[in-house]
Amino acid sequence: MMDDSLRVSILSEALPYIQRFSGRKIVVKYGGSIMEDEKLKEAFFRDIALLSSVGVCPVVIHGGGPEINRWLNKLEISPKFENGLRVTDEKTMEIVEMVLMGRVNKQIVRGINKTGSLAVGISGLDGNLIQSRELGDGSHGLVGEVTQINPELLDPLIAKGYIPVISSIGSTADGISHNINADFVAGEVAAAINAEKLILLTDTPGILKEGDNPNSLVKQINLKDARKFIEKNIVSNGMLPKTECCIRALAQGVKAAHIIDGRIEHSLLLEIFTNSGIGTMINA
């Protein structure tokens, strides 16, 4: 049981951060194991609600890979991946849209709203929020990359205190839908709305200097050194695209990007409101 003096100490430590980030926008990518664990999900919803209640303006971006796989299997469609990307034909894209927009998005909205905060679920199709094009040579089918974010839809929602919850689907000018990596969507949205922070919830502690050794966690790094980590292959495999999207967001004006372990309960608050943080912060 936490004693009163410890509670006061925690609140005292959080106060300057609450004052600093009140009125600022923070984009959070929600994904990984946290989406599969009821206790972690509930903690995340409360964390987002708390951020909103102290004046921070959170925006949530989500994917939903495991749920997509479940529905593909139910419909006897085998999920296919190449180089870590889902091969998305037209039939698969229909399932992706159904699951992300109609199921996962609304589950998140419902969870946040139950806390007393007001979330609004939208996709990248709404108001042409996320414009996209086919990724690379098209070998992955309807997998896309962001070409433009139109923040006009988000600005009035944020100004009125709503919490936008955005599924990572974009479309071309011709209305062709694309399945887009949620990390990169989060980075581009953060840049487009001039966010103070981009935070990626992952299944790792953050950037590690030594393979999978959690004791080698890099707590803080600047943009220049983050690029060097990539050049030296210190950052590789699944951490590579996450670090790249952070770098791109910082290069477009986001003040700081964080890669944190979503498997730790209340990791979002621990990263934002404590002196030591819990993951890796990349500064511009």
From Swiss-Prot:
It comes from the Bacteria. Pfam families: AA_kinase. It catalyses: N-acetyl-L-glutamate + ATP = N-acetyl-L-glutamyl 5-phosphate + ADP. Signal peptide: none annotated. The record marks 29, 242 as: Transition state stabilizer. Keywords: Amino-acid biosynthesis, Arginine biosynthesis, ATP-binding, Cytoplasm, Kinase, Nucleotide-binding, Transferase. PANTHER family: N-ACETYLGLUTAMATE SYNTHASE, N-ACETYLGLUTAMATE SYNTHASE, MITOCHONDRIAL. Catalyzes the ATP-dependent phosphorylation of N-acetyl-L-glutamate. Its main location: cytoplasm. Substrate binds at residues 64-65, 86, 179. Its EC number is 2.7.2.8. The gene is argB. One of its GO terms (biological process) is L-arginine biosynthetic process. The keyword Cytoplasm applies. This is Acetylglutamate kinase. It is found in: Cytoplasm. Pathway: Amino-acid biosynthesis; L-arginine biosynthesis; N(2)-acetyl-L-ornithine from L-glutamate: step 2/4. GO terms for cellular component: cytoplasm. It comes from Prochlorococcus marinus subsp. pastoris (strain CCMP1986 / NIES-2087 / MED4). One of its GO terms (molecular function) is ATP binding. Belongs to the acetylglutamate kinase family. ArgB subfamily. The keyword Glycosyltransferase does not apply.
